[in-house]
């Protein structure tokens, strides 16, 4: 429906930005209220979501299902990671419960040899006062190590039988 206007007069343009009641020079107030309210109710009665093509709806549903499946998989992976114990080596302080035996055959030099008397035919179960002194000296050298279950602390005799070195490198995980 066109609004009547005189063809001899040019259509006024809206050069005044402060006038909020005009649209392209035509005042909104000139539209009859009955028509305006009719258009307004038609706009309000429109459905909120435009109906999509069934193929588009199907694709969107598939995408949503895939996203949900991915989220579920991520949650399951996180739960599995939480359930599995961490298998990274832990740092443990060496304690005096470690027994030193000549049968242990690995050493890493810590730049500080410890001179101790050596007994070649000593069993690991017997502990003499000299072995406890030896243990204390070696422990004073080796302060922190990654401990293992079988050999928390690895030491061997050097070619010179009266020298021991402390080990800082260990090879397995800490015992629980």
Curated annotation (Swiss-Prot):
This is Uncharacterized protein DDB_G0288467. It comes from Dictyostelium discoideum (Social amoeba). Residues 13-24, 47-88 have a biased composition (Low complexity). Signal peptide: none annotated. Residues 1-88, 109-132 are annotated as: Disordered. Residues 1-12, 37-46 have a biased composition (Polar residues).
